[in-house]
């Protein structure tokens, strides 16, 4: 039998006002954390800060300030994410979702989505729902990836992992909820902004990127590859893992941005190749950092891939070989941006350099 709950108009107003006040406070707090964390991360890097677009004079006014661009986009994304998950009942699952979704991070995937949309003539508002959807799915994958049955990680973004705070059962549900919310958010928020045929294509692209031919496939092969003898496994095997586990979602982020921005098929394919390169680049650098940085520097447990016996680039080709591969991938990514307006391509050129030179 259904239970009827009667609320007075004043009670409803009070609850609504409380949620609004909490949301405003949360956005302000999140904005402050974003500026501090991104400023720290970007200031410590040797490259990717000030990028000189092709054909521009070498002065401070024409140089592209990637640090400022990244902070501003992250602030916009964080504000949109905060609004997307209000504190409604049941509170526990909403809190678990918000704990990981609003934990900070570099927001590389939504930034890529927005920058790709802007590259082909779109704007931030048009891309934002897709950018948030990609970040929701990324966060979902991190929550599940950290579980004891997967990577069994204790730290993520400098904080205890979701299951350490809310328990394994709630972490599984939080990840599931984010996966569903991603598609709901993208389709509902974009209604009226994006043509239905474009939205259908975007949904298919995103679903394909995370299913059994995408992220899930990469995670499965990654788990199955633990303790394999690196002498008997080639780079092709490792590339398969990371093209699916890491690059697939980055690829989807870029392609969704171009779709939302009304790009051509040729532009979609160029950005797909660009994202594939930076996806592999991201993982090569991640493998390097895992064996060269401390837990404090990374914000997650250092050396856990080595301890788990996982296949990594340094394990297969050494640190120097891994660095050479990273530089090759960075150059190949930049080559895909030739022919675009240099000023609009500047954020993506800078993003490739940022990923190559990051320290955490």
Swiss-Prot record:
One of its GO terms (molecular function) is metal ion binding. It is found in: Plastid, Chloroplast. It is an enzyme of class 2 (transferase). Mg(2+) 2 binds at residues 145, 151. It holds the Pfam family polyprenyl_synt. Keywords: Carotenoid biosynthesis, Chloroplast, Isoprene biosynthesis, Magnesium, Metal-binding, Plastid, Transferase, Transit peptide. Binds 2 Mg(2+) ions per subunit. It catalyses: isopentenyl diphosphate + dimethylallyl diphosphate = (2E)-geranyl diphosphate + diphosphate; isopentenyl diphosphate + (2E)-geranyl diphosphate = (2E,6E)-farnesyl diphosphate + diphosphate; isopentenyl diphosphate + (2E,6E)-farnesyl diphosphate = (2E,6E,10E)-geranylgeranyl diphosphate + diphosphate. PROSITE patterns: POLYPRENYL_SYNTHASE_1 (PS00723), POLYPRENYL_SYNTHASE_2 (PS00444). Its EC number is 2.5.1.-, 2.5.1.1, 2.5.1.29, 2.5.1.10. It comes from the Eukaryota. One of its GO terms (biological process) is geranyl diphosphate biosynthetic process. Isopentenyl diphosphate binds at residues 106, 109, 138, 157. Residues 1-39 form a transit peptide. PANTHER family: FARNESYL DIPHOSPHATE SYNTHASE, GERANYLGERANYL PYROPHOSPHATE SYNTHASE 11, CHLOROPLASTIC-RELATED. Monomer. No interactions with GGR. This is Geranylgeranyl pyrophosphate synthase 9, chloroplastic. It comes from Arabidopsis thaliana (Mouse-ear cress).
